[in-house]
Amino acid sequence: MPKPVANQEDEDPTPYLFVSLEQRRIDQSKPYDSKKSCWIPDEKEGYLLGEIKATKGDIVSVGLQGGEVRDIKSEKVEKVNPPKFEKIEDMADMTVLNTPCVLHNLRQRYYAKLIYTYSGLFCVAINPYKRYPVYTNRCAKMYRGKRRNEVPPHIFAISDGAYVDMLTNHVNQSMLITGESGAGKTENTKKVIAYFATVGASKKTDEAAKSKGSLEDQVVQTNPVLEAFGNAKTVRNDNSSRFGKFIRIHFGPTGKLAGADIETYLLEKARVISQQSLERSYHIFYQIMSGSVPGVKDICLLTDNIYDYHIVSQGKVTVASIDDAEEFSLTDQAFDILGFTKQEKEDVYRITAAVMHMGGMKFKQRGREEQAEQDGEEEGGRVSKLFGCDTAELYKNLLKPRIKVGNEFVTQGRNVQQVTNSIGALCKGVFDRLFKWLVKKCNETLDTQQKRQHFIGVLDIAGFEIFEYNGFEQLCINFTNEKLQQFFNHIMFVMEQEEYKKEGINWDFIDFGMDLLACIDLIEKPMGILSILEEESMFPKATDQTFSEKLTNTHLGKSAPFQKPKPPKPGQQAAHFAIAHYAGCVSYNITGWLEKNKDPLNDTVVDQFKKSQNKLLIEIFADHAGQSGGGEQAKGGRGKKGGGFATVSSAYKEQLNSLMTTLRSTQPHFVRCIIPNEMKQPGVVDAHLVMHQLTCNGVLEGIRICRKGFPNRMMYPDFKMRYQILNPRGIKDLDCPKKASKVLIESTELNEDLYRLGHTKVFFRAGVLGQMEEFRDERLGKIMSWMQAWARGYLSRKGFKKLQEQRVALKVVQRNLRKYLQLRTWPWYKLWQKVKPLLNVSRIEDEIARLEEKAKKAEELHAAEVKVRKELEALNAKLLAEKTALLDSLSGEKGALQDYQERNAKLTAQKNDLENQLRDIQERLTQEEDARNQLFQQKKKADQEISGLKKDIEDLELNVQKAEQDKATKDHQIRNLNDEIAHQDELINKLNKEKKMQGETNQKTGEELQAAEDKINHLNKVKAKLEQTLDELEDSLEREKKVRGDVEKSKRKVEGDLKLTQEAVADLERNKKELEQTIQRKDKELSSITAKLEDEQVVVLKHQRQIKELQARIEELEEEVEAERQARAKAEKQRADLARELEELGERLEEAGGATSAQIELNKKREAELSKLRRDLEEANIQHESTLANLRKKHNDAVAEMAEQVDQLNKLKAKAEHDRQTCHNELNQTRTACDQLGRDKAAQEKIAKQLQHTLNEVQSKLDETNRTLNDFDASKKKLSIENSDLLRQLEEAESQVSQLSKIKISLTTQLEDTKRLADEESRERATLLGKFRNLEHDLDNLREQVEEEAEGKADLQRQLSKANAEAQVWRSKYESDGVARSEELEEAKRKLQARLAEAEETIESLNQKCIGLEKTKQRLSTEVEDLQLEVDRANAIANAAEKKQKAFDKIIGEWKLKVDDLAAELDASQKECRNYSTELFRLKGAYEEGQEQLEAVRRENKNLADEVKDLLDQIGEGGRNIHEIEKARKRLEAEKDELQAALEEAEAALEQEENKVLRAQLELSQVRQEIDRRIQEKEEEFENTRKNHQRALDSMQASLEAEAKGKAEALRMKKKLEADINELEIALDHANKANAEAQKNIKRYQQQLKDIQTALEEEQRARDDAREQLGISERRANALQNELEESRTLLEQADRGRRQAEQELADAHEQLNEVSAQNASISAAKRKLESELQTLHSDLDELLNEAKNSEEKAKKAMVDAARLADELRAEQDHAQTQEKLRKALEQQIKELQVRLDEAEANALKGGKKAIQKLEQRVRELENELDGEQRRHADAQKNLRKSERRVKELSFQSEEDRKNHERMQDLVDKLQQKIKTYKRQIEEAEEIAALNLAKFRKAQQELEEAEERADLAEQAISKFRAKGRAGSVGRGASPAPRATSVRPQFDGLAFPPRFDLAPENEF
């Protein structure tokens, strides 16, 4: 196998190709709602999966997975595929086809390491950026010869499809691997080539191939060479192909590899001398520098530092993903495999290194001149040495080249820049020509001169590129990709639909909008970019500027794809124009395009190169004209444009057009490579990048055309030829291929929508052709099986006939020997023996003479035959030589014909192009005419519209007049309103003036006050200073009071909110604890249920084992019966043998004459015994047949009766289910009544004090409920009685099941016999098929002999005619010459007659041979017909046996299913009963806890009522305080001016406090939301638990119904089977024992069921109570919440009324105590949760111990299984020993049989006694044989018992493993719950810590305020004590401080700033 496929490890590729079953189950179990699931756009992920929550008009609310909800327009919402299409292999199969679905499928497959996906007709490959083992030898074998739908998506599947299409359709194929740069095209191309080399590998290997590698290896090894010299690192790709290549892989007629050739396109030469910072040059430069091949660096004169060579070190010099040393070794090995000589390799390396050295040649400016001169000769010397030329001459030609001016050559001096440019051009030219020479050399190596029939082309073109700097190379690359995309679009969307129309298929043309013609025309059409570039290249004075201007003037604004470039970013070069390609808009910089297009070289240096000593350098420049014009192609090879001047763009266009022509002549296969991200990281998908590529590549449109259209098609003759095997008789008389194809398709019963019949082809939808192939394979399989059976039948008949002939011959020989033994002692016979030889003595001599004469004649004939044979051989040799010559000439003609065909194909393609152009022009003309007609129609419409508009204008004028009148009215109203506004403005101005006057008055008063203060200060400075200090202190005091008031207000609000929040948290904590306790009880009950379930499973397993043992016993009895039958049949066979032997003895006695009377009596006795044996045999056969018929009849009757009984049981089960459903409905009604009662009771308890009289009504309702419960108890008893009846019926059903199992075993034995017969028939069919093949081979040989004989006969006929002609000539001569020559004529006549006689004899012999061959042929044909009939009969027998086998299988399967269903339903009902009993006990406990909680709530309700009363009292006090404050406000009205500033400060403080309140409310709402969310989660958990119980109850009801039906059916079957009980007495005994055990079990189950029923009823009552209690708790919680809201309102009002600091301080202390208590309760809850956590840990440890015990049990079971396996092997060995003993006994019997024959030979002498002894001995031997057979049967039974025991142990082991898995799942769930509890504890602690921190902060602020107030009070007291006497201006302050009150604002009283009342007044 070629190395790129085989050198990887053969790892299992399955995980990288298939979606595992487990993952598929996970994917398909994802939640999905077809109406709600949707995709919405996202900036980062492209699309997000969500669920529609609500719809409001065009806006849709979509909930995402993280809980986020987004509102989005409905048109942006996309549908979602069902989960079954998750990670689908072919996206054409998706039900919903849109961009998000395609993106999601590709992304999920990429994440699952599945990089290949089908997209309709083509394959999408995403670059994984890492190695996957999907290209190994093992993987390649998976895809070899497989259809696309049989294997997962892969590049190998596409490759194999192309290979098969090439061989099947005889059409050249092409594989177009496209995509952007870095998408993985080159790697996929290498894998494709390696695969084709593997598939087409030839098995022949000769010595020459071994020395340089096979053709397959050579094809593969071209990749390393081309990659080394043509690939480089770019920004987007570390191994980017910087050239395009089209590799043709040629195959011979048999599909074997016959050679290859490579075409390359546009190597990026500029990369040789310049690279960007993040890129590097071609790999070969860095590979040579790695030095991995010894001696190369020395040959190339290279150093170890890459930076010594500037032209290859301008960017990156190393690549992380590429090992240059290893790659260089592979490149060097590839040279060897491709047949490069050592000299050629070294020359390649030298030229490559010389390019590196040329970049280091240095030059400088000479003095004051413009000319350059060399700056050192070191690098130039190395270049000259490597090139094999003179250094001085090289520098001379570079600095002063000779140029041609007119007809003369002149020397031109160049400056440094010109010389540098010239060296760069030489570097590029040398490397480009070296690359082309390498390609040419590879093509020569791959040209094997073998016969080529078809090829597969693989295209690898550089992908679409958008860089920061895009030049001429990028334009050419992008133009190529544009053409390929257009080709793809044309193939997929245009040609496909045009072919539908051309073929007459009903099809509506779909315009996918994928036409790229405008962009292509912009580049390549006349006056396009390339044409303008070539035109500018012709003009000597043209520059880049003129080229840019011409482009802009020609296309800007006139061609849509030609656009202005975007402004450059900082540091970037400006672009000159931009083109809108299919993959995006690209900005191009045209700097240097003219030089690149001209590609000039220094002709003087080229001439020097052509004279160098490096042969390779001379060869690569051999086609360059140079200055002398002596190139190989100078005469006519490049005679294009302008006298031999050819540009790079024109050559590239020609290559591209040739490529497109080649692709159009092939059948294309597309592979789309996708780059997932720009970072080259594996497993990362950039959604927008991938979506852009999908849109550009037409992936969605390709899927749509594949789904809507008919991608597969075949010509009618081809279809008929390939699929005529499906219905050969139906199309036998049809000559029209179309009609025949239609008949063939209709015979397959395909849906008409899956195919269409065109004029010349039949079209199929995707995947249908694969179904046709499956039909064909199935048909071929049947035919081959029939042929094999026919041949085997023929061989069997032939062998049987031979045995019959041998038997007859043996009898004849035996008879003759017996006669001889009788006659040998007879004297007369002895005399006759002596006399007979003497009678023939006289005739011996005559016989000898006759034989000698005959021998002589034979020798003469032999000599004549030899002579004729030699002549014929010579003639044959001559004819063979002529044939060889004709074949040679024919092959030459074929080659010429192939050339003509290729030319014809090219002309046809050109014709098609012209026709397409003509068609396009005609279509455009039609479109223009349509447009003209449309314009005319539009003109008419416009005239009509104008007339209508005129009418509208008139109407509008009338409306305008009316509007003007309305306007006048409105203007009058507006003037009135303006007057009113002016009046209001005057009032406002008056008010403003009054306000201003009031302000001035206030200001005056302030000024007077200030003047008075100044006067006082002037009179008493010290006093003024003290007063000033007092004022400052008072201001500080006022501020402190305000701050304290604000703080106190905030503190009161925060504390009130905190208290409310803590109360709500406490309630929630209590609810949480209750729910947690309920969950814990549920978990414990679940564990107990699980334990009981396991116990029941153990019991079920025990019963199953008992059933299996009984079945095994029945099987043993059946086997014993069968053994008895076999023994009986064997005895009958031996009896028949004895009868036959008696007949033979009778014949012998008759021959001997029967001389004695004893012999006569013996004969009579023997005949009597024989007749008796015959009668016994016939009677036994008749009895056996009658018994068999009775058994069959009984079996059929039993089956019918069982079916009827099953139906009756099903009916009874349905009836019981109906009754149970009725009871269940009554139970639900009772529960509803209980719930209503609970609600009434709760309401009565809430208003118990006011509504005490309603208690009697509640009591009456309770009595009614008790009566209902009593009725329910009665119904329960009734149900228990019915349940006991059902159990009794179940017992009867189990007995019937045991009988059915016996019948099933008998059917199984019959099935095994039928299978054995079918196997024997299949073997006979195989034998007949082999014989048939041999006969065909013999028949072919005979036909060849007949043809050879016919040819020989024809030759002899020609010779005869020739002889006749010669005779005629001689006769004419004789008549003319006369009698003179009569003697000569006579002699000639005799000769001719002799020759004529010989010819006639030869003809006669040949005719005889022909006649014999004809007879042989006829005989063989008759035998073939006989064999055909035998095969038909065998097929009929086999089909009948298969039908019987299927019928028996079906019957057995139905009974198995019925028995399994009954057992499963019984187990399920028992399990559910146990579950309900445990649930009942659990609900009882929950009910008791609910009662306790109810009492606690009552007490709490009473406490809250007391608190409410206290609060109402406080509200009254608050009202009185408000009245006092209102009086104080009136007294302080006079101080309004003085306190205005304080009012403003109070307003600001109020705003701050309101903000704080809002923040606190926001925090409170968040806390409430969190609490509500947790409550909702708990409610959902409880609801899920309730639903689970309800589902279990429903399943129990269903199982009870099934049991009832099964019991009824079993009763009916029992009645019908009673008639057969007498015939099955032995089985009845065993069944009675099993029935007794079953009765015991049923009684036990009945008792358990009664207990379970009782427990179930109790559990239901408890559950109803718990549900009622839950409802009461919920209503109580709602009522408490309402009361809390009311209390909160009252409390806030009370707080606003109590603004004294003493009350605030007391509240603060109370709040501190409450927070401490709350903290203590939270700590207690934490400790409780920790204890629960420890309990859960202990439960987890117990579960782990149980799991360990289960594992130990499993290990024990495995040990037992191993022990039983050993016992099984021992039993098998014993059985083999018994078999050997049986064979030995059979051999002994055979020997005794021989002795019996000898004894019979002596019977005449021995008489009657000897016969009796022998018969006695025979009977003894038969007894021994029977005993031995019984022992053998016992051994077989023991063996089967052991096997069954092993199976049981394995089953038990599997059950243990499943139990272990269930335990592990339970452990995981408990661990998850533990984590949830921990998280809840942490959240509660965080809430408590937050509340405590808030309280401490408030308390701290309060203490600080109190300290500041105390200090201020002390200071004021001191200053007032000192300055009380002199306080003149302050004496007007009337109010004492104890009653100082804030002013009123907006109707609310502010709390007092401060109060100095002592603490004992609090």
From Swiss-Prot:
Region annotated Disordered, chain positions: 1822-1862, 1922-1962
Subcellular compartments: Cytoplasm, Myofibril
Coiled coil regions, renumbered to chain: 802-1927
Region (Actin-binding): 656-678
Gene Ontology cellular-component annotations: A band; cytoplasm; myosin filament; myosin II complex; polytene chromosome puff; sarcomere; striated muscle myosin thick filament
Chain ranges of the Myosin N-terminal SH3-like domain: 33-82
GO process annotations (BP): adult somatic muscle development; border follicle cell migration; epithelial cell migration, open tracheal system; flight; locomotion; muscle cell differentiation; muscle contraction; muscle organ development
Binding site for ATP: G179, E180, S181, G182, A183, G184, K185, T186
Main location: cytoplasm
Positions of the IQ domain: 780-809
Signal sequence, renumbered to the chain: none
Assigned keywords, A-Z: Actin-binding, ATP-binding, Calmodulin-binding, Coiled coil, Cytoplasm, Motor protein, Muscle protein, Myosin, Nucleotide-binding, Thick filament
Tissue: Expressed in larval and adult muscles. Isoforms containing exon 9a are expressed in indirect flight muscles, exons 9a and 9b are expressed in jump muscles, exons 9b and 9c are expressed in other larval and adult muscles.
Xref: InterPro entries: Kinesin_motor_dom_sf, Myosin_head_motor_dom-like, Myosin_N, Myosin_S1_N, Myosin_tail, P-loop_NTPase, XRCC4-like_C
Entry's Gene Ontology molecular function annotations: actin filament binding; ATP binding; calmodulin binding; microfilament motor activity; protein homodimerization activity; structural constituent of muscle
Positions of the Myosin motor domain: 86-777
Family, as annotated: Belongs to the TRAFAC class myosin-kinesin ATPase superfamily. Myosin family.
Subunit structure of this chain's protein: Muscle myosin is a hexameric protein that consists of 2 heavy chain subunits (MHC), 2 alkali light chain subunits (MLC) and 2 regulatory light chain subunits (MLC-2).
UniProt function note: Muscle contraction.
Record's comment describing the protein's domains: Alternative splicing exons contribute to the specialized contractile activities of different muscle types. Exon 3 encodes the hydrophobic pocket adjacent to the ATP-binding site, exon 9 is adjacent to the actin-binding domain, exon 11 is involved in actin-binding, exon 15 in the S2 hinge and exons 18 and 19 the non-coiled tail region. Limited proteolysis of myosin heavy chain produces 1 light meromyosin (LMM) and 1 heavy meromyosin (HMM). HMM can be further cleaved into 2 globular subfragments (S1) and 1 rod-shaped subfragment (S2).
Name of the featured protein: Myosin heavy chain, muscle
Gene name of the encoded protein: Mhc
